[in-house]
Amino acid sequence: MRIVWKLFGFSRRLLQVEWCHPSESILLFTLVPRLRKAPSVFLLGQRQGLSTMPEIEASVRDSELFSPPSDVRGMRELDRTAFKKTVSIPVLKARKEVVNRLMRALRRVALQRPGIKRVIEDPKDEDSRLIMLDPYRMLTADSFDKAELGVLKELDVSPQLSQYNLELTYENFKSEEILKAVLPEGQDVTSGFSRVGHIAHLNLRDHQLPFKHLIGQVMVDKNPGITSAVNKTSNIDNTYRNFQMEVLCGEENMLTKVRENNYTYEFDFSKVYWNPRLSTEHGRITELLNPGDVLFDVFAGVGPFAIPAARKNCTVFANDLNPESHKWLLHNCKLNKVDQKVKVFNMDGKDFIQGPVREELMLRLGLSAEAKPSVHIVMNLPAKAIEFLSVFRSLLDGQPCSTELLPTVHCYCFSKDSDPAKDVRQQAEAVLGVSLETSSSVHLVRNVAPNKEMLCITFQIPTATLYRNQSLSLQNDQEPPLKRQKTGDPFSGEPQIASDS
């Protein structure tokens, strides 16, 4: 690192100041493009400024000193004994009774490394302790500043430094350090995952697959509470929203329990859809609801929208086509003590809208009470939910309700467009046959992949779309409205309430 700065021909200290002479500023910023090409040397952070040199150097130094041995490169089967390494650390000897006071004074120069004790016993003197110091900050006794030397003198501690051979083992390295040392140089390292109870859910790339079992073992070893690591082997199934997975390490048991926003959910992760990255979104929708509101959850999964809404004293109708999701939805309603507040259905989304949703809307929107609850419809099936909006066209008969009582839809979707908000609005407009330009909002949920966003478009269903007579009078030139299949029952699919059975 020092060589890099020397090659560029100016002092590292230049970047450590917050203000510099104009001539120095010109030199600094002409070097920015070149410095950005030097890995781990120069960073432009999200603060839109220059990262301070202490931050950069600390990271580089740490990776140099505490990197695993080079001969683990290419390891396919984890051998923990191969990670042994000895490093030389400067230490300061002090009487054990003054160690606590001394440590407070030496925070600047003490060794900062998770999993390594900064104070150890002196093998040659049981009444003394050895304080481990930062090997880059503490080269000699002259490296102490004036205040630190004053404390040493006050406590009668000699500033003389000694060297201690510290043995590092597999347990002392972080997961990203291990994987960076093992995987081929220059390739992306997977150290993150989605946690689903005791399960670490990884989504490995092709170049990481030869090391998949080692990666899974490292994830289990380095993350307390994780006892199983799995990798997705196929895309999400569009029918039931689950995916094929391979157990990389640990137990095969996929029955798990998670806590999200103070609610508990239990399910078989191999058979249902669950995404812990949607926790904030589940909470956001819940915040939009008021006690007494009505929520229709068209693709309810195991209940992350339905259950919080029910606990907020909303009337909830929750549906999912997947029989496993339906089973665990019933179970979780009971588990969270809202089984009497949620009506659960196991139907196709279109049938659910044309059946239970239609029947309830006809009933509720036709009431004459002055204070009517708001109606919300959540459609969390990003790959296909936009298509289901067509079911709302000419869904209701009779006299239209007032505008403020029209149901509010929260529809999730994906976009790869450069203007994703505009894109999803246009998609929804194309399906509904009306403009949503001034009557909708689009919320960015999360980035799914490079150039792929997940969004939620929220809007009230226009009267011209929702009511049959309005649709016919305003859109005679469009396709005939969808007709609900007639059955002997008011709607196909009976609601179920969670029970002991």
UniProtKB/Swiss-Prot annotation:
Q: Which reaction does it catalyse?
A: guanosine(37) in tRNA + S-adenosyl-L-methionine = N(1)-methylguanosine(37) in tRNA + S-adenosyl-L-homocysteine + H(+)
Describe the function of this protein.
Involved in mitochondrial tRNA methylation. Specifically methylates the N1 position of guanosine-37 in various tRNAs. Methylation is not dependent on the nature of the nucleoside 5' of the target nucleoside. This is the first step in the biosynthesis of wybutosine (yW), a modified base adjacent to the anticodon of tRNAs and required for accurate decoding.
Q: Which GO cellular component terms, listed alphabetically, does the Swiss-Prot or TrEMBL entry include?
A: mitochondrial matrix; nucleus
- Quaternary assembly: Monomer.
Q: What family does the entry list?
A: Belongs to the class I-like SAM-binding methyltransferase superfamily. TRM5/TYW2 family.
* Keyword terms, alphabetized: Cytoplasm, Methyltransferase, Mitochondrion, Nucleus, S-adenosyl-L-methionine, Transferase, tRNA processing
Biological process terms in GO annotation: mitochondrial tRNA methylation
Instruction: Give the residue ranges for region: Disordered.
Output: 474-501
Residues that bind S-adenosyl-L-methionine = H282, D320, L321, D348, G349, N380
The identity of this protein, by name, is: tRNA (guanine(37)-N(1))-methyltransferase
Locations listed in the record = Mitochondrion matrix; Nucleus; Cytoplasm
Q: Which GO terms describe its molecular function?
A: tRNA (guanine(37)-N1)-methyltransferase activity
Source organism: Mus musculus (Mouse)
* Keyword S-adenosyl-L-methionine found: yes
Q: Which PROSITE patterns match?
A: SAM_MT_TRM5_TYW2
What EC number(s) has UniProt assigned to this enzyme? 2.1.1.228
Q: Does the keyword Transmembrane helix apply?
A: no
Q: What class of enzyme is it?
A: transferase
